[in-house]
Design a protein with these regions (language model features):
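Structural recognition of the beta-strand scaffold that forms the well-ordered cores
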Residues: 1-3, 31-35, 58-61, 86
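Solvent-exposed coil/turn segments that connect beta secondary-structure elements
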Residues: 7, 37-40, 62-64, 92-93
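Short active-site neighborhood of thiol/selenol oxidoreductases, capturing the structured segment around
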Residues: 1-13, 19, 32-33, 112
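Thiol-/selenol-based redox modules, centered on thioredoxin-like
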Residues: 82-135
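A short beta-strand-turn-helix
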Residues: 1, 21-25, 98-101
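Structural microenvironment flanking redox-active thiols in thiol-disulfide oxidoreductases
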Residues: 13-54, 65-73
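Short, internal strand/loop/helix patches
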Residues: 49-92
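Sec/Tat-exported extracytoplasmic proteins
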Residues: 5-8, 20-27, 91, 124-132
Length: 135
């Protein structure tokens, strides 16, 4: 899962510890990578964000993040990302359908805004399949 976040973003701060718990619970079958977006900050600011808000998964503060994010948005045909956090999930290089946290009847290729960890876990269980659920 790729999580596009900002150190300034209130929902990003609120869900960081929950994302860490989700990653730890599923670490044998799941990788979570956070990419800073909409800001240019030092690595120290990102470390401080991680320590303050419990974001203990891989965080990238690379200048290449914008290029990666642009490619992801093009891949899923999402025109203008203007809100953080924003997440996509891939399995075997294929973007996965995710529940819409605003409309339970719809699915899409991304999460927009803060998403309840229970919803992400439900989607992860579906993505990882029956073999995973047995482990």
């Amino acid at each position: 899962m790729l999580d596009f976040f900002g150190t300034f973003c209130a929902p990003c701060k609120q869900e960081a510890a929950h994302l860490t718990q989700l990653w730890r619970k599923n670490a044998q079958n799941f990788v979570l990578v956070g990419l800073t977006h909409f800001e240019e900050v030092s690595d120290e600011v990102v470390r401080e964000f991680a320590n303050t808000f419990g974001a203990y998964y891989f965080l990238s503060n690379s200048k290449q993040n914008a290029r990666i994010i642009a490619q992801v948005l093009q891949d899923i045909n999402y025109q203008r990302m203007e809100q953080l956090p924003f997440k996509v999930a891939l399995k075997d290089g294929v973007y996965q359908q995710l529940s819409n946290n605003f409309d339970k009847e719809k699915k899409g290729y991304f999460y927009l805004g803060a998403v309840p960890s229970e919803l992400m876990q439900k989607d992860l269980n579906a993505i990882l399949g029956k073999e995973y659920a047995k482990n």
